Amino acid sequence: FDPYFTMDGVSRGYSVYFRETDYGEFNVANYLTNSFGAGIQFGYPINEIQRIGLNLNYDKTDISAGTLPAREISNFLNSEGDIFETLKAQAVWSRITLNRGLFPTNGSSIDVLFQTTVPGSDIDYYKINLRNKIYRPLGFADLVFGFVGELGYIGTYGDTEVTPFFENFYSGGPRSL
């Protein structure tokens, strides 16, 4: 299977999915989602280490809140409803200088992403992300210093007043300082 759409290294991909997730089972929050969607992705190489990507994805999500859901879940469902369809457009710029794709020991990977729902979607929001991974050898015992960081911002536009709680950014977790 050749992932490239043209001889110049332009890539094209497709995705189709269906997800049922009960977040109460994971003790995360008291709600469940059913969602399905499809998308198409294109990637274009700028040079040996840089690439841009353009993605378009359709998504339909149904959210069911359990008893006594968190305030952010209730606020979103009261404001925007519990079933909605979105068409998301995403642009990505990547710069990768890793010495290898799996288990790198030197180099960095930087991604800048801008995602927005297309006007006419049931909810209108946008996200900006910056992801960075840096690996440097420590010079003894084959040890490698690794740093992974992510910054993000989410906002709404149009008639949407509350950001989708399932798209929010969170700090902390088992792999955080």
Which residues are covered by each model-predicted region?
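Gram-negative/organellar outer-membrane beta-barrel architecture
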Residues: 1-100, 109
